[in-house]
Amino acid sequence: MASLKALKVRITSVKSTQKITKAMKMVAAAKLRRAQMAAEAGRPYAERLDAVMSSLASKVTVGPQSPKLLAGTGNDQVHLLVVATSERGLAGAFNTNIVRAARKTADSLIAQGKTVKFYLIGKKGRAVLQRLFPGKIVHQVDQSHIKNVAFSDAHMVAEDLIGRYSAGEFDVAHLFFAKFQSALVQEPTELQIIPVPLTADTGAAATGASAAVEYEPDEEAILTELLPRNVAVQLFRAMLENAASEQGSRMTAMDNATRNAGEMINKLTIQYNRTRQAAITTELIEIIAGAEAL
């Protein structure tokens, strides 16, 4: 049985930890509101741009002269997995879920005989992916200096990715991030960003929504300008979603930790009181026994 001194030290330690987790929860809650508003504000623009891209692409014939970001390389052998995680931990299963989704896709592609490479945004996924896929990480973007995500941050990453794509380093790029649903729910999401995916359904829907629209100059010229921007916009959206998801997950994790600390303090306090009571009882018995001996 633990001594009274040891129990008292442990109770003090848990109370100190509880204060820290409670403070982190409050900070995450304050940041969550701002991050959530930014993520929700960015969705309509990204979705509308995607619809415009589909509308434009449905009006052109994809061929050798089409923009490479639309037509692709003509191959799908080398896949680059762009994994966006956080720079800091203590965010529950936020980073784990994103890495798990990327790992699942990587395993599936490798099983099909494809070559897989990783491009990391944030440092929290590096250790696991380096261990599971040694030598496959081609680059890591350091975001430790970023307090609030800006479009310029996403634009720099987009330029680097497009440059690598143009240089023939990969054929297809998949983006992994956590789509924010609520403080309790963040959905791991995979999105192909290079080449721009255009399904028959989205193309038809976009065509129907903008059937009366005429483009000047021609659609292919506009696509040449918009395709790189679309990559940056999708990256920016993912970063905003990640920022909100990270704070939501951290707030929930710290709330759980605070409540667990409270329960542990209660249990330790009960154990402390019982131990103290037992010690007092033992002393009384010894005093009474000594008195009777006299």
From Swiss-Prot:
Membrane disposition: Peripheral membrane protein
Species for this entry: Rhizorhabdus wittichii (strain DSM 6014 / CCUG 31198 / JCM 15750 / NBRC 105917 / EY 4224 / RW1)
Matching InterPro entries: ATP_synth_F1_ATPase_gsu (IPR035968), ATP_synth_F1_gsu (IPR000131), ATP_synth_F1_gsu_CS (IPR023632)
Function text: Produces ATP from ADP in the presence of a proton gradient across the membrane. The gamma chain is believed to be important in regulating ATPase activity and the flow of protons through the CF(0) complex.
CDD domains recorded: F1-ATPase_gamma
Record's subunit section: F-type ATPases have 2 components, CF(1) - the catalytic core - and CF(0) - the membrane proton channel. CF(1) has five subunits: alpha(3), beta(3), gamma(1), delta(1), epsilon(1). CF(0) has three main subunits: a, b and c.
Residue stretches in coiled coil: none
Protein name as it appears in the record: ATP synthase gamma chain
Keywords for the protein's UniProt record, in alphabetical order: ATP synthesis, Cell inner membrane, Cell membrane, CF(1), Hydrogen ion transport, Ion transport, Membrane, Transport
